[in-house]
Design a protein with these regions (language model features):
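Conserved beta-strand scaffold positions in the cores of enzyme catalytic domains, especially
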Residues: 29-31, 79-81, 317-320
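Flexible "cap/lid" subdomain of the alpha/beta-hydrolase fold that forms the substrate-access gate
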Residues: 9-27, 38-39, 44, 51, ...
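Conserved HGGG/HGGXW glycine-rich cap/lid loop of the alpha/beta-hydrolase fold
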Residues: 38, 42-91, 125
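Short, hydrophobic alpha-helix immediately C-terminal to the catalytic nucleophile
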Residues: 66, 133-137, 337-341
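Catalytic active-site module of serine/aspartate enzymes centered on a nucleophile-bearing elbow/loop
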Residues: 314-359
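N-terminal targeting or regulatory segments adjacent to alpha/beta-hydrolase or S9 domains
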Residues: 1-18, 357-359
Length: 359
């Protein structure tokens, strides 16, 4: 039974290239019953070319991909962009284990079925890259290519993620560990969503300098928001007031608990995936990051980028965009769009060309 519903609020598809991408109502908003939850997603370019699925990270929403939706649809692709479970207008289950990787990948498999599609290129940013990589690894029959933005997701390690992160933190608290606490980070982030989001978006971007930049580690007992700084004056032009307002309105409505539950499943994901020891992603892949992304500063994280081709043997290219931080798709949409379209064109044409994976 088709359980999808669709509502085009804004412009017809043919006019998408002319719309204000910052207007969330300019896109085709849909809902489907997927893997036991009600999922919200954007669906543009129905009935045209190959399917591309875009997965957001934290603290983002489908909306972070707004400029990619327009560019990819204009280029002839069907573009589907969900709010992942726990985010935005998608359902937010209460149980922490409802956010483990088996459920997240199950959501993508279920979404494909609801769409009536059998093949897609999957693209993920930040924690969306965790889901995208796992989906590509577990279901190569469905996902023909993989793109990760900003977060180099490692293969399954020999120890639980929490153990490795504690060693990296050297007595301090890495943000993943902070977010694993119950209720405390939820309350702190939700106390003033506008301050939270403006501080996070600015500090993790390439626009922040010096002491404004995101501190990945806080001291024991220090509030996580001390690691971020609000911009002085107007926000940089890559995030308009209208865009910030949309993020703030959604997180004010939903809170942060669903999103934080992904971090609370880090060890659980490791525990349930022993069968992935030594597994690699064999499909063609691409990595796009920011040279000014604070998240790449720890040597342990940077080494994942440097050694990426070891576990992505079909890596076509890895790129660090100069002056760009952790929000590459928003900070530098033209460059990101160009790289995505180049990769997709090669993939769809069957071009085996592979540049040296250097950035």
């Amino acid at each position: 039974m088709d359980t999808r519903t669709s509502m085009r609020i804004g412009q017809p598809l043919a006019a998408m290239a002319q719309v204000d991408a910052d207007d969330p109502d300019a896109f085709n908003h849909c809902f489907a019953d997927v893997n036991g939850i009600r999922m919200h997603y954007i669906d543009e370019g129905q009935g045209q070319g190959p399917l591309v699925i875009l997965l957001h990270g934290f603290p983002y929403l489908w909306y972070m991909w707004r400029r990619q939706i327009v560019a990819l649809t204009k280029a002839g692709y069907r573009v589907v962009v969900p709010d992942q479970r726990g985010f935005g207008q998608s359902e937010r289950p209460d149980a922490i284990e409802a956010y483990d990787m088996s459920q997240s990948v199950g959501d993508m498999v279920g979404l494909m079925a609801a769409l009536g599609e059998t093949s897609a290129v999957i693209i993920g940013h930040d924690l969306g890259a965790w889901v995208a990589q796992a989906a590509a690894m577990l279901r190569p029959d469905l996902f023909s290519g993989l793109v990760m933005l900003n977060t180099p997701v490692p293969p399954r390690g020999k120890v639980k993620p929490t153990v490795g992160l504690q060693a990296m933190a050297k007595g301090r608290v890495y943000h993943h560990l902070y977010f694993q606490q119950l209720t405390k980070p939820d309350r702190e982030l939700a106390a003033d969503p506008r301050k939270t989001l403006s501080s996070v978006f600015y500090s993790i971007s390439g626009s922040a300098v010096g002491a404004e930049r995101w501190r990945l580690f806080v001291e024991a007992g220090e509030p996580i928001l001390n690691a971020f700084t609000e911009p002085k004056g107007a926000f940089p032009s890559w995030l308009s007031p209208r865009s910030l307002d949309y993020y703030v309105a959604e997180y004010t409505r939903t809170g942060f608990t669903g999103a934080l539950n992904y971090y609370r499943c880090r060890d659980r994901n490791w525990e349930i995936t022993a069968f992935l020891d030594g597994a690699k992603v064999s499909q063609p892949s691409l990595f796009i990051g920011g040279a000014a992304d604070p998240s790449l500063e720890p040597v342990e994280i940077r080494s994942l980028y440097d050694q990426m081709d070891a576990y992505l043997p079909a890596l076509r290219k890895k790129v660090l965009l100069p002056g760009v931080g952790h929000s590459a798709a928003e900070e530098s949409p033209a460059q990101v769009n160009e790289l995505l379209l180049e990769f997709l064109e090669q993939l769809m044409s069957g071009d085996p060309t592979s540049e040296p994976a250097a950035g």
